[in-house]
């Protein structure tokens, strides 16, 4: 679904923008927003890794049953819930058991490694940059989307999508394997690039 949306958006919005800008400027915009998406995603990922690393290191230095609750909430979906609950119940009955403590430290290291090795593939950040450009250059163009039964102006569509990406990025729900801040990075860099270009030329379609 995510890939289909990207391909559809690239065709729908990209073809209009390429006709407006021309192939050269379109490619410049596409690559810059793609790089901007990667930059913001990398920055956010490094911050998240640092946060997890600090918590894990604190736990490894002073492991305990109570402290493990805080730790496993970081990425509890890494392990089977039933298996984890069984382990916690057993450990609760014998909190000084060194084998349980050692196993909890292994879980802590696994959480950190999982955070360090999260793969990221795709160019959807650049696609969201195109979506932002469409909304800025053709703000009052009506869009008819399958999942929205009424026509909606491009500027409002972009605002809604941007707000949803920000909410989902901040929420960081378990199992959500979408790089929301990459999408926001593409939109952010696209916004500043269009503002820069419009200093010399102001064209807005309606």
Q: Residue ranges of each PLM-predicted region?
A:
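A detector for small-residue-rich transmembrane helices and their helix-helix packing motifs
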Residues: 1-206
């Amino acid at each position: 679904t995510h890939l289909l949306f990207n391909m559809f958006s690239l065709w729908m919005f990209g073809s209009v923008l390429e006709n407006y800008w021309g192939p050269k400027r379109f490619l410049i915009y596409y690559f810059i927003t793609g790089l901007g998406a990667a930059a913001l995603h990398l920055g956010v990922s490094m911050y998240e890794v640092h946060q997890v690393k600090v918590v894990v290191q604190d736990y490894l230095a002073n492991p305990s049953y109570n402290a493990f609750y805080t730790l496993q909430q970081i990425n509890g979906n890494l392990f089977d819930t039933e298996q984890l609950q069984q382990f916690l119940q057993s450990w609760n009955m014998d909190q000084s058991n060194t084998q349980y403590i050692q196993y909890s430290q292994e879980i802590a290291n696994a959480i950190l490694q999982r955070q360090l090795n999260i793969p990221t593939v795709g160019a959807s950040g650049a696609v969201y940059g195109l979506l932002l450009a469409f909304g800025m250059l053709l703000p009052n163009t009506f869009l008819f989307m399958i999942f929205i039964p009424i026509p909606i102006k491009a500027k409002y569509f972009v605002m809604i999508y941007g707000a949803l990406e920000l909410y989902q990025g901040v929420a960081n729900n378990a199992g959500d394997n979408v790089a929301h801040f990459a999408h926001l990075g593409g939109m952010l860099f696209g916004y500043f690039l269009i503002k820069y270009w419009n200093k010399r030329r102001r064209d807005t379609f309606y």
